[in-house]
């Protein structure tokens, strides 16, 4: 049980590691936060609520081995101190019910940038940053995640939707954004929608 929770945590932190040999030896370098767009005038109250994970791109993602993934949802609950309690809801493998993963995103000095709260709970994580790159708040968001774990830098971009389906144009925009950060087609995957768990 503890092992499966740890594996889930690593996946959601951007370490979607494949079973392929040498999957992390040649990671695409993570970009500096300064080179990643930041949503102007970020409005934390409008960003809160449920988002569906429509797409993922990252330097530990491999389409040729993962293909696609089952959609999950993430709920951002705004707190009085402008941090978010963030809950991701996933479908467990083999009809084992729903899985919930809760963490805290603490605002940094720039609106739309966050760090992981309670870092002591994640001893393998040396740093963890979240940056809202772009959003219209009511349809889509693209969020950049970067972490250092065991002296390796991982990054991912998540394409969120307020609904389970997004237009081909938004998916193409997401793909272009991921490639602008050095990722390739093989590092970009899209989810398969589900009605299990993620609307809870």
Swiss-Prot record:
Induction: Upon Toll-like receptor (TLRs) stimuli. By SV-40. By insulin. Expressed in the cortical tubules of the kidney (at protein level). Also expressed in the medullary tubules of the kidney. Detected in lung, spleen, uterus, vagina and epididymis. A carboxymycobactin binds at residues 72-74, 147, 156, 160. It comes from the Eukaryota. One of its GO terms (biological process) is cellular response to amyloid-beta. Residues 1-20 form the signal peptide. The modification Pyrrolidone carboxylic acid is found at residue 21. Disulfide bonds join 98-197. Enterobactin binds at residues 128, 156. Keywords: Apoptosis, Cytoplasmic vesicle, Disulfide bond, Glycoprotein, Immunity, Innate immunity, Ion transport, Iron, Iron transport, Pyrrolidone carboxylic acid, Secreted, Signal, Transport. Pfam families: Lipocalin. Glycans are attached at residues 81, 85. Disruption phenotype: Mice are normal with no visible phenotype. They however show an increased susceptibility to bacterial infections. Neutrophils show significantly less bacteriostatic activity. N-glycosylated. Monomer. Homodimer; disulfide-linked. Heterodimer; disulfide-linked with MMP9. PANTHER family: LIPOCALIN, NEUTROPHIL GELATINASE-ASSOCIATED LIPOCALIN. Belongs to the calycin superfamily. Lipocalin family. Iron-trafficking protein involved in multiple processes such as apoptosis, innate immunity and renal development. Binds iron through association with 2,3-dihydroxybenzoic acid (2,3-DHBA), a siderophore that shares structural similarities with bacterial enterobactin, and delivers or removes iron from the cell, depending on the context. Iron-bound form (holo-24p3) is internalized following binding to the SLC22A17 (24p3R) receptor, leading to release of iron and subsequent increase of intracellular iron concentration. This is Neutrophil gelatinase-associated lipocalin. It comes from Mus musculus (Mouse).
């Amino acid at each position: 049980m503890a092992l499966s929770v740890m594996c889930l945590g690593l996946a959601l932190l951007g370490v979607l590691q494949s079973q392929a040999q040498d999957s992390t030896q040649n990671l695409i370098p993570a970009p500096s936060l300064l080179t990643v767009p930041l949503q102007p005038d970020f409005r934390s109250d409008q960003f809160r609520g449920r988002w569906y994970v429509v797409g993922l791109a990252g330097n530990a993602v491999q389409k040729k081995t993962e293909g696609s993934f089952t959609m999950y949802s993430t709920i951002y609950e705004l707190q009085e101190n402008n941090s978010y309690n963030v809950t991701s809801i996933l479908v467990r493998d083999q009809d084992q019910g729903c899985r919930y993963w809760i963490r805290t995103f603490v605002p940094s000095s720039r609106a739309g940038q966050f760090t992981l709260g309670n870092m002591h709970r994640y001893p393998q994580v040396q740093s963890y940053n979240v940056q809202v790159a772009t959003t219209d708040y009511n349809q889509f968001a693209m969020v950049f995640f970067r972490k250092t774990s065991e002296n390796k830098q991982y990054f991912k971009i998540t394409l969120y939707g307020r609904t389970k389906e997004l237009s081909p144009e938004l998916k193409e925009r997401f793909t272009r954004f991921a490639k602008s950060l050095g990722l390739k087609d093989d590092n970009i995957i899209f989810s398969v929608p589900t009605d299990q768990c993620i609307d809870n």
